[in-house]
Amino acid sequence: MGQKWKLYEIKDGKVIRKNKFCPRCGPGVFMADHGDRWACGKCGYTEWKK
């Protein structure tokens, strides 16, 4: 917790998100990239990568 600044980067003066937001929890709750899937640590929602 407390390191959300690592999930953003600035390119050409614009802020770009590195990870996806959780569709259940909404903006502000990032999903973790586990290689074969995206997972939300708050609600447990998981999206499998192809």
UniProtKB/Swiss-Prot annotation:
Pfam families: Ribosomal_S27 (PF01599). Zn(2+) binds at C22, C25, C40, C43. GO terms for biological process: translation. Keywords: Metal-binding, Ribonucleoprotein, Ribosomal protein, Zinc, Zinc-finger. Its cofactor is Zn(2+). GO terms for molecular function: structural constituent of ribosome; zinc ion binding. GO terms for cellular component: ribonucleoprotein complex; ribosome. Binds 1 zinc ion per subunit. InterPro entries: Ribosomal_eS31 (IPR002906), Ribosomal_eS31_arc (IPR022845), Ribosomal_zn-bd (IPR011332). Belongs to the eukaryotic ribosomal protein eS31 family. This is Small ribosomal subunit protein eS31. It comes from Pyrococcus furiosus (strain ATCC 43587 / DSM 3638 / JCM 8422 / Vc1).
